């Protein structure tokens, strides 16, 4: 059972020395995300939220954060376009979040600096629609003639 030729050495899953080096692939790239999975992993470990941290937890959290950011930016972009602006400002973020039911509930306790307030006028303070119609009706009616005297 002797083999002739070169003897292969085991490298325990590593590449043998002298093999061409491949470029490293980040966890974010593997997961197909834009948000940094490695950085979120570091923050979760540093924060000591739990004794141990699963491998999928930071990937899942990065995906959730990326989805929320995309949702808010989409709505804020629509708000900016409605105001005929090409740049998103804090006001557009506030309008987008407060006008969306689910995001408004999620971020109800959040104050956005330079966001202002939602435009809201109490219905009692609005002019009554019926008040304008009687004035028009009086102007269009023909004047009442007094009875003729004999």
Swiss-Prot record:
One of the protein's GO biological processes: heterochromatin organization
Name of a matching Pfam family: Histone
Position of sequence motif SPKK motif: 146-149
GO cellular component, one term: plasmodesma
UniProt PTM comment: Not ubiquitinated.
Localization in the cell: Nucleus; Chromosome
Alphabetized SUPFAM superfamilies for the sequence: Histone-fold (SSF47113)
Assembly with partners or alone: The nucleosome is a histone octamer containing two molecules each of H2A, H2B, H3 and H4 assembled in one H3-H4 heterotetramer and two H2A-H2B heterodimers. The octamer wraps approximately 147 bp of DNA.
Family according to the record: Belongs to the histone H2A family.
Name of this chain's protein: Probable histone H2A.7
């Amino acid at each position: 059972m002797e083999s002739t030729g070169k003897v292969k050495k085991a490298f325990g899953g590593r590449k043998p020395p002298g093999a061409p080096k491949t470029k490293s692939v980040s966890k974010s790239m593997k997961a197909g995300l834009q948000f940094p999975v490695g950085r979120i992993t570091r923050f979760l470990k540093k924060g000591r939220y739990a004794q141990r941290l699963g491998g999928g937890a930071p990937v899942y959290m990065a995906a959730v954060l990326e989805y929320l950011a995309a949702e808010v930016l989409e709505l804020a972009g629509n708000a900016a376009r409605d105001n005929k602006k090409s740049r998103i400002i804090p006001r557009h973020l506030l309008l987008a979040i407060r006008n969306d039911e689910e995001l408004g509930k999620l971020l109800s306790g959040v104050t956005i600096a330079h966001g202002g307030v939602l435009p809201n006028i109490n219905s009692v303070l609005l002019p009554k629609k019926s008040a304008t119609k009687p004035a028009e009706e009086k102007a269009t009616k023909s004047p009442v003639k007094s009875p003729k005297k004999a």
